[in-house]
From Swiss-Prot:
GO terms for molecular function: large ribosomal subunit rRNA binding; structural constituent of ribosome. Part of the 50S ribosomal subunit. Forms part of the ribosomal stalk which helps the ribosome interact with GTP-bound translation factors. Forms a heptameric L10(L12)2(L12)2(L12)2 complex, where L10 forms an elongated spine to which the L12 dimers bind in a sequential fashion. It comes from Methanococcus maripaludis (strain C5 / ATCC BAA-1333). This is Large ribosomal subunit protein uL10. Forms part of the ribosomal stalk, playing a central role in the interaction of the ribosome with GTP-bound translation factors. The keyword Ribosomal protein applies. InterPro entries: Ribosomal_protein_uL10, Ribosomal_uL10, Ribosomal_uL10-like_insert, Ribosomal_uL10-like_insert_sf, Ribosomal_uL10-like_sf, Ribosomal_uL10_arc.
Length: 335
């Protein structure tokens, strides 16, 4: 807390501001420091309107925010919270929310918007001007375009660019003249928004690199892990609620295959065993000479008679298909 002896040396508004910041810091379980240094006023207002219902954003002086964080850490006996000040940067602000850090990062990232590049700024990428009409009438702007290296000319009463031209490459400094031209052409190569400096949750501070994940890649890894775990459970015969049906089906199919191969007759395998024996009989008969066959066998061989239709294998096939579909069905429950 602010020492009472020194209160007369501190402006009252600063004391009030620190107290307000402390109240905000204690109000939510998720506290984030964000960088808003390069965000123009118009874009900032748009962002605030987008996130208003999900979080509280408060701007203040870094010195006051630092003091508020340190005092809250001391009052709550939470030294880890005090480490949040290490992530503070010029132009920082505080966000208080109940949104988990990953969702918070995604929400802030999606709230970013394109903006013109300022003179003196470093180009974030190659900035290319496409060939075509600018829609502007002949005038001083033609000279401005040529001054920044654009092949401009009058075409059908309008100023046009004759060919695609890269006016500045990634990493190069954008001149003030080029900044004016790009703005006039409506080109916004910069993405502005609130950048995460650090997010505190339950004793852990996450940085932007921790929170920035490829969702498709992450989901793919989860799906792969699920499928591997499913197959391990089935093959190692470790029943779970997700795999017990497949394990039983596999055991049934394996037992049935053994029964058929060993000619062990049961009510489930009799048809398959007889069908197999019949097929083997026809195959052997086909290798024998005509003198060794009766007329019935000769007729069956010449007509290509098939073994009796067996219903069980069809059922088995369906079961196998069901087994193959089981992992993806389980994934459907996850996502």
């Amino acid at each position: 807390m602010i020492d009472a002896k020194s209160e007369h040396k501190i402006a009252p508004w600063k004391i009030e501001e620190v107290n307000a910041l402390k109240e905000l810091l204690k109000s939510s379980s998720i506290i984030a420091l964000i960088d808003m240094m390069e965000v123009p006023a118009v874009q900032l207002q748009e962002i605030r309107d987008k996130i208003r219902d999900q979080m509280t954003l408060k701007m203040s002086r870094n010195t006051l925010m630092k003091r508020a964080i340190e005092e809250v850490a001391e009052e709550t006996g939470n030294p880890e919270f005090a480490k949040l000040v290490d992530y503070m940067d010029k132009g920082a602000a505080i966000i208080a929310t109940e949104m988990n850090p990953f969702k918070l990062y995604k929400t802030l990232d999606e709230s970013k918007s394109p903006a013109p590049v300022k003179g003196g700024a470093v180009a974030p990428c190659d900035i290319e001007i496409k060939a075509g009409s600018t829609g502007m009438p002949p005038g001083p702007f033609l000279s401005e375009l040529k001054a920044v290296g654009l092949p401009a000319a009058i075409d059908k009463g309008k100023i046009g660019i004759k060919e695609d031209t890269v006016v500045v490459k990634e990493g190069e400094v954008v001149s003030q003249k080029l900044s004016v031209v790009l703005s006039a052409l409506g080109i916004k190569p910069v993405t502005v928004g609130l950048n995460v400096l650090g997010v505190y949750e339950d004793g852990i501070i996450y940085t932007e690199s921790d929170l920035k994940i490829d969702e498709e890649e992450f989901i793919g890894k989860i799906q792969k892990a699920y499928t591997s775990a499913f197959n391990l459970s089935v093959n190692a015969v470790i029943p779970t609620s997700a795999t017990v049906e497949t394990i039983v089906q596999k055991a049934f199919n394996d037992a049935k295959a053994v029964s058929v191969e060993s000619a062990f007759v049961t009510d489930k395998t009799a048809d398959a065993i007889l069908g197999k024996a019949y097929a083997q009989m026809i195959a052997v008969a086909g290798l024998a000479g005509d003198d060794a066959l009766d007329e019935d066998l000769k007729g069956k061989i010449s007509s290509g008679a098939a073994a009796p239709v067996e219903e069980a294998p069809v059922e088995e096939q369906k079961e196998e298909k069901k087994e193959e579909a089981a992992p993806s069905a389980g994934l459907g429950m996850l996502f």
